[in-house]
Regions:
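Conserved blade-ending motifs and adjacent loop-strand segments that build the rim/top face
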Residues: 310-331, 375-405
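Blade/loop signatures of beta-propeller domains
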Residues: 69-121
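C-terminal motif of bacterial Sec signal peptides marking the signal peptidase cleavage site
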Residues: 52-54
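Short coil/turn segments at the loop-to-beta-strand junctions that recur within blades
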Residues: 128, 169-176, 217-223, 268-272, ...
């Protein structure tokens, strides 16, 4: 019996001999060509994605991005703030116009009546809804006072007579809330208070009635700021406590309104470990900012992309730290010199005066007051009496905390401080009957009191 022939059939079809017919062969060739083109297209597409991803990653590494709540990217911080040469340093100008100030080593006695022409007491309204734990910064705004209480993450606005006006925002994780109130600054151009929420990585802008106007993400970390027109002057570097992971360098950075750095750095010696080379706070007046360099004992003015030394302090005719000490600064050298010689870490400024609280270590670390007229460069050093029943025995030790106007200093005083010597202090001689009665009725846990002292022109 003849065996049956088995013919293998291609999926494309075949004749009885298993040979693909010309038509089917052509179809297969076309499909193979199509597959090759398709594979080539896919290959090019994947290659293009790889190139785009590489460029995007490179761009990502060299560009700013918003920081998420509680996040910290050390690489980005170092790249933009420390090492990026595309961000130019500040231009230092007017180095030859620096005022020279000699800080006395001994504490002179000065009758405050020869310095101040009038006094005014403004008790801040007290309520459980707006209790102030501590005043970290007070800003005199048109018609009101803005007060920062960092410890309790609160910012309050009080009327000029001390009546409560409003609280800025609420604590929380929502976009329109804040986790802390690390710093505040006044945006004079837009008449708004800007709050730095460092934990939440954002800036919140409020009008003077407490209405939220804008929320912006941070692109890098900083702990103090000043609003200079459309730009923000930021003080970056190590902060305190839970923010100790921030890079251990202190830098000034000028950022535009979008948060991008446009000026950076500061041409002085590097900071000593675990401490800023700068004073505790920057001070803002109009569209300029001021800060103190603690190693060079110099007060600087920053205006736009320029900065200038405006005041240099000496002790016994020379700077506290020699050139060699500045270049090889240590905590021990810094602390020892601070413990033995007078120094200042803050500055308050108006169009008329510069006020510098001065610590006198050999006088029990009491704070005296150096006053400088910006018109005449004349200087007055206000000492503190050792008579603790007098007005001038304890008021200067509290500050001052700023200027209420061009010639009036603001002191913030806790009620229990006033009550300690209220029965004997001559503060009553300078207050109205109503103010004296109010002083008498203060309670230790009441909100702080503002004391306005008007300077006598010199």
């Amino acid at each position: 019996m003849e065996k049956m022939k088995v013919t293998k059939t291609s999926i494309l079809g075949s004749d009885s001999k298993g040979v693909i017919c010309p038509t089917l062969r052509r179809v297969k060739q076309l499909l193979r060509g199509t597959n090759m083109k398709r594979n080539t297209t896919i290959l090019y597409f994947l290659l293009l994605i790889g190139i785009i991803s590489g460029c995007t990653e490179k761009e990502r590494r060299n560009s700013l991005r918003p920081l998420s709540e509680g996040s910290f990217d050390k690489e980005y911080q170092q790249h933009w703030i420390i090492t990026d040469d595309s961000v130019k340093p500040f231009e230092v100008v007017r180095e030859d116009k620096c005022i020279q100030v000699e800080l006395p080593s001994k504490l002179p006695y000065s009758d405050l009546d020869t310095i101040f022409s009038s006094y005014k007491l403004i008790p801040l309204e007290t309520s459980e809804e707006f209790l102030i734990g501590n005043i970290d910064r007070i800003i005199k705004c048109p018609g009101c006072y803005c007060i920062q209480d960092r410890e309790n993450a609160n910012v309050f606005i009080f009327e000029e007579n001390g009546k409560f006006r409003c609280k800025l925002g609420n604590k929380g994780h929502a976009r329109n809330e804040h986790l802390d109130a690390w710093s505040i600054a006044y945006d004079e151009k837009n008449e708004q208070i800007v709050m730095l929420d460092l934990t939440g990585r954002r800036l919140l802008s409020y009008d003077l009635m407490g209405n939220l106007k804008k929320v912006a993400s941070l692109f890098f970390l900083y702990h103090d700021m000043a609003i200079l027109g459309d730009d923000i002057l930021c003080l970056t570097g190590s902060a305190y406590n839970r923010f100790s992971d921030i890079i251990d360098l202190s830098r000034l950075v000028l950022a535009d309104k979008m948060g991008k750095p446009i000026r950076r750095g500061f041409p002085i010696t590097e900071m000593i470990r675990n401490r800023f080379t700068y004073g505790d706070k920057m001070t803002q007046y109009k569209d300029k900012a001021y800060f103190t360099d603690l190693i060079a004992d110099t007060v600087w003015e920053v205006s736009g992309k320029e900065m200038a030394p405006i005041l240099n302090m000496t002790v016994n005719g020379s700077q506290r730290f020699s050139k060699d000490e500045k270049e090889n600064m240590t905590d021990h050298i810094f602390e020892m010199r601070h413990a033995k010689q007078p120094h200042t870490i803050q500055i308050h400024i108006s169009s008329e005066y510069i006020a510098l609280p001065v610590a006198i270590p050999r006088a029990g670390s009491l704070i005296a007051l150096m006053l400088i007229s910006r018109k005449s460069n004349r200087q007055k050093f206000v000492g503190i009496s050792t008579n603790h029943t007098r007005l001038d025995s304890y008021l200067p030790t509290t500050g001052p905390d700023g200027f209420a106007d061009d010639s009036t200093l603001i002191y913030t005083i806790q009620p229990n401080t006033i009550l300690l010597g209220a029965s004997n202090t001559p503060i009553k001689d300078h207050l109205s009957k109503e103010e004296r009665e109010l002083l008498k009725n203060l309670k230790p846990d009441d909100n702080p009191v503002l004391l306005l002292e008007r300077l006598i022109d010199f």
